């Protein structure tokens, strides 16, 4: 990835590779992040259901902006299509509006491009901005051994790992989107299309309380190895995850190794708040007004990430 960072003209605060870039504007900083829905779009096409991928687009961007302590405020979207399809575009827009309202942001512009011969079907991405006071930026540099990890539950796969999920469930196992999930009242398709959880309300509530937060992580592609984006020189012992959603167990049953599962998927935790042990209970009390959360582990000083799996074994990265 090429990243041009000329500090002669702009005061850039974060290093490349963090969840969002920060540029200082006086005593404020603007946070910027861009992301897309990825191959989850193929599930939408299989189901002929397009009114939720816009929520995924919003979520992938705003959840990343939160990770530097910024409150998301606005987004522009980019829809690239093989051929114009007004009905599909209207469904996609419906999801974008839903996600924007839930995140309390404005969609201030966008672009729709028809690219026959370049793109197949469609692709959807967004770029968002947020603001934060410079003295309230959270980069992860304050993380230290002994800190606790508070995990906020996911509602399923979110928007990462769909290449592996499709291979395991459809190519290898031969399931269809209409097959019933084990131990659930939903189909496989319904579980796969479920929109990504939006974490704006609970995390912004923490910002307003001005709790001592050392790090924030959106658990996306890469699973818990995303924690390495926050600070070098520390590790994480994750020993008490919530029950993994059934969709992950079904994928695992198709001979996907646990080491790969926990490196690709969120495995039931979509967002992590890192704080001191003394602050954890207060933070969880606020979070529980919005979502399910629990202490899932601690920060260590050995640079390894160790995760206790739902089978009781451990995987290390």
Where are these regions (language model features)?
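Short, small-residue-biased leader/transition segments that mark boundaries at the very start
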Residues: 2-4, 273
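Short helix/loop capping segments that flank catalytic or ligand/cofactor-binding pockets
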Residues: 41-42, 159-161, 227
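Short Pro/Gly-enriched beta-strand edge/turn motifs at strand-loop
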Residues: 5-8, 255-256
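A generic structural signal for residues located within well-ordered alpha-helices
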Residues: 53, 160, 195-198
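Glycine-rich phosphate/pyrophosphate-binding loop regions near the starts of catalytic domains
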Residues: 8-155
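Glycine-/charge-enriched secondary-structure boundary and capping motifs
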Residues: 88-106, 119-122, 176, 182-193, ...
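Short, acidic (Asp/Glu-rich) active-site segment that either coordinates a divalent metal cofactor
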Residues: 137-184, 188
């Amino acid at each position: 990835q090429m990243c041009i960072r000329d500090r002669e003209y702009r005061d850039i605060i974060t290093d490349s590779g963090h969840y969002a870039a920060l540029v200082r504007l006086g005593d404020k900083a603007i946070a910027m992040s861009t992301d897309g829905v990825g191959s989850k779009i193929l599930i939408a096409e299989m189901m002929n259901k397009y009114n939720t991928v816009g929520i995924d687009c919003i979520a992938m961007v705003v959840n990343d902006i939160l990770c530097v302590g910024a409150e998301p405020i606005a987004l522009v979207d980019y829809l690239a299509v093989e051929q114009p399809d007004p009905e599909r575009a209207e469904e996609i827009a419906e999801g974008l509006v839903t996600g924007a309202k839930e995140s309390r942001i404005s969609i201030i512009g966008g672009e729709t491009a028809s690219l026959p011969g370049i793109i197949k079907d469609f692709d959807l991405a967004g770029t968002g901005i947020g603001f934060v006071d410079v003295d309230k930026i959270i980069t992860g540099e304050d993380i230290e051994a002994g800190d606790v990890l508070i995990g906020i539950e996911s509602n399923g796969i979110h928007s990462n790992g769909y290449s592996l999920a499709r291979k395991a469930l459809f190519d290898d196992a031969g399931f269809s989107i209409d097959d019933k999930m084990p131990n659930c009242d939903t189909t496989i398709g319904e579980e796969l299309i479920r929109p990504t959880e939006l974490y704006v309300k609970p995390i912004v509530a923490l910002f307003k309380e001005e709790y001592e937060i050392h790090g924030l992580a959106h658990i996306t592609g890469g699973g818990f190895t995303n924690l390495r984006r926050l600070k070098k020189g520390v590790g994480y012992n994750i020993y008490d995850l919530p029950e993994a959603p059934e969709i992950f167990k079904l994928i695992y049953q198709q001979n996907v190794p646990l080491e790969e599962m926990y490196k690709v998927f969120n495995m039931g935790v979509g967002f992590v708040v890192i704080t001191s042990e003394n602050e954890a209970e207060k933070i969880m009390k606020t979070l529980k007004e919005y979502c399910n959360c629990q202490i899932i582990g601690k920060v260590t000083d050995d640079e390894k990430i160790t995760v206790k799996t739902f089978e009781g074994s451990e995987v290390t990265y």
